[in-house]
């Protein structure tokens, strides 16, 4: 009997690596008609977990503001009150 690898968890491993290490996608697209360039698009996207993003200096202010807002909401006296 030979060992086999379960392929059903490959997507989970991929997402784990993507969130932990991150990825940068860059694309340049030029739309032409009859060899005449009409539209130029330059795209750049960074995909990663928030921990990785803040380690690289991305979304630091956004993360800090949302953490502060969340902390203020959870410690407010109205957060513990339930509606009947």
UniProtKB/Swiss-Prot annotation:
Changing residue 45 to E: Very few gas vesicles. Transmembrane segments: none annotated. The keyword Endoplasmic reticulum does not apply. InterPro entries: Gas-vesicle_GvpA-like, GvpA, GvpA-like_CS. Residues 27-29 are annotated as: Beta-strand 1. Changing residue 11 to A/D: No gas vesicles. It is found in: Gas vesicle. Residues 46-56 are annotated as: Alpha helix 2. Keywords: Gas vesicle, Plasmid. One of its GO terms (molecular function) is structural molecule activity. PANTHER family: GAS VESICLE PROTEIN A1, GAS VESICLE STRUCTURAL PROTEIN 2-RELATED. GvpF to GvpM interact with each other in vitro, and may form multi-subunit complex(es). Might interact with GvpA1. This is Gas vesicle protein M1. It comes from Halobacterium salinarum (strain ATCC 700922 / JCM 11081 / NRC-1) (Halobacterium halobium). The gene is gvpM11.
